[in-house]
A protein has these predicted regions:
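Amphipathic alpha-helical scaffolding segments comprising HEAT/armadillo-like alpha-solenoid repeats
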Residues: 12-14, 39-53, 75-93, 111-124, ...
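Short inter-helical turns and helix N-cap capping residues of alpha-solenoid HEAT/ARM repeat scaffolds
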Residues: 57-58, 95-96, 127-128, 158-159, ...
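Conserved hydrophobic register position within alpha-solenoid helical repeats
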Residues: 65, 103, 135, 235, ...
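Alpha-solenoid repeat junctions
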Residues: 69-77, 107-112, 139, 143, ...
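Short beta-strand-turn/beta-hairpin segments enriched in glycine/proline and small hydrophobics
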Residues: 144, 152-168, 183-204, 224-225
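Short histidine-centered loop motifs in beta-beta connectors
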Residues: 163-177, 205-213
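A structural signal for short beta-strand/turn segments enriched in small hydrophobics and glycine
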Residues: 175-187, 213-222
């Protein structure tokens, strides 16, 4: 996969800049800032930070450490934050997706680090869709369009498959809102406890593909999730910088009235279309 190193031209415009460069690339991570009822507000000592970055640390402690380092970066404490950078790179292969997701978000905070750029090219191919999407957003900060397919995916419906074979029992109805980790359905496999199907992404239930009570096979499509407003908003800001003319039709579909998209998101879609057209024409 080739990395695009040249940053695309960004025409000036205060309204567009305000929409694009607000609190950049934050929304997608929000569901993981509070993990299992744990508030990551306690300031960690250097000793604790080092301990929590070890491979033997509890995943939520590692996430706590990553969030504190990201706060140091945001405050401009470069010397303090960079001392931990060598300990971050091994976390690219951490077994827990919440940790990899937070790591991708953190690496987007310091776009001067070549090591972070390289790590993000790995994370953008992660098995977890939320990790891939955060990595794609972070890559935009490096002027790298490698994550563009993921950004486009954030604008499109996501199909949920059954992780097990058995009798499907839906928990939600169509149009219900969904957060990351929301219980979507249960699959009765013959074991004492049914297998829980939880959402990997935020959004809302767009369509049920199988009748409730039907026997499904492992890997069978069961549900379609439409993207959340926050994910669409973030993707549009990323595509503002790296989008191409072939993306215009997908983006155009977001400019009309919708019960699930805020006016600012539809406006961002129009701005993104405008700047992609200008970029393609060399203006």
């Amino acid at each position: 996969m080739t990395t695009e190193k040249t940053k695309p031209h960004i025409p000036p415009g205060p309204k567009v800049k305000l929409l694009v460069f607000g609190v950049a690339f934050l929304m997608v991570l929000v569901p993981f800032l509070f993990w299992k009822g744990t508030w990551f507000g306690t300031v960690l000592s250097d000793q604790k930070l080092a301990e929590y970055l070890e491979s033997s640390a509890r995943p939520r402690d590692t996430q706590h450490a990553l969030l504190q380092i990201s706060e140091q970066i945001a405050r401009g404490e470069r010397e303090q934050s960079r001392r931990w950078y060598p300990s971050l790179l091994p976390l690219v292969t951490h077994p827990v997706p919440e940790v990899r997701n937070t790591l991708a978000w953190l690496m987007g905070q310091d776009a001067k680090q070549a090591e972070f750029h390289q790590a993000l090219t790995v994370l953008v191919k992660d098995s977890n869709p939320l990790v891939r999407r955060n990595a794609a957003l972070a890559l935009v900060r490096f002027g790298d369009a490698q994550g563009r397919p993921e950004l486009l995916g954030m604008l499109r419906p996501f199909t949920v498959v059954s992780p097990r074979a058995g009798v499907l029992r839906y928990r939600l109805k169509e149009d219900d809102s969904v957060d990351t980790g929301t219980l979507l359905a249960r699959v009765e496999t013959g074991e004492p406890e049914p297998f829980e199907v939880r959402s990997l992404l935020p959004g809302f239930v767009s369509e049920k593909l199988i009748e409730d009570g039907t026997t499904v096979t492992e890997g069978q499509n069961i549900l379609v999730l439409a993207p959340s407003d926050a994910q669409v908003w973030e993707a549009l800001r990323g595509l503002y910088l790296v989008g191409q003319t072939e993306d215009l039709e997908t983006i155009q579909n977001l400019t009309g009235r919708s019960t699930h998209l805020a006016e600012r998101t539809r406006q961002q879609a129009r701005f993104t279309i405008e700047v992609i057209k200008k970029r393609s024409s060399g203006v």
